Amino acid sequence: MKKLILLAMTILVLTSGGFTQPAAAESLRVGCECTYFPFNYRTNDGVLTGYDIDVAKGIIGIIGADVKFVCQKWDGMIPALLANKFDLIIASMSITEKRMQKIDFSIPYRISVGQFVGKKGANLDLFNKDGSPNPANFKGLKVGIERATTYENWISANVPSANILLYDTNEALYLDLQNGRTDVIMTNPMKAFLKFLSKDKGKNFGFVSPPLDDPKIFGVGVGVGIAKGREDLLKRINSALKSLIQDGSLEKYSLKYFPFAIHNEKWEGVE
């Protein structure tokens, strides 16, 4: 009789939910280009790495979720997020008012700037001593930029007489600059230094402008993109980012890839 009672109690516990399987770990899908050196790119062995990848792993590690990276072309990045192909954009995307009309962003994890690269000794005189552009010297100048970036907005707003040439990849910018198809290019200075100017192919080229950081165009910095309506996840991401800022992890990540750190003062006091 005791055995029957024990068996009945065991069945009751199992069927009433007393026995539960461990909860599956949360999984977050991260969209990035996978070709944007040194921020998110594949090594010769096919390993996805870069500053953005380290940031993504750092954030999601603090959150306690699993991460899956999804490669996506740049000009389709926001549409893919809105189509639920991934949960987050961690791909060096600048926070701008235009983009914030469609998606939400975390606090910045990197400053956002642009800089012109051209041939050494060309004496283009594109900028005045105070750092402002000289529109007259941009007239008819062939300026290469990557498609769907904020650099096109800067040129249109400041030197509209320039002849803009659009490219699908950053690598194509360097090639046409070398071949003389463009006079200058506008791009990210950190990436330009690492991938072009520090290489033999870029020895005859250099920066021909100061760093340009107009927040109205480039935004307040680079952030994590997320679909609107996911406020709880956004709060967790911001909390994780603040931890990475405070413990020096972001600076550590930058020094793995860049010849200089992204300055701490740019991160202090972000809310």
Where are the language model's segments positioned?
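Short helix-initiation/N-cap motifs at beta->coil->alpha
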Residues: I53-D54, K68-P79, D130-G131, L165-N179
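Extended ligand-binding regions for polar small-molecule ligands
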Residues: D54-I62, G121-S132, L141-K142, T149, ...
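A conserved helix-loop-strand patch within extracytoplasmic ligand-binding domains
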Residues: A65, S94, Q101, I107-N153
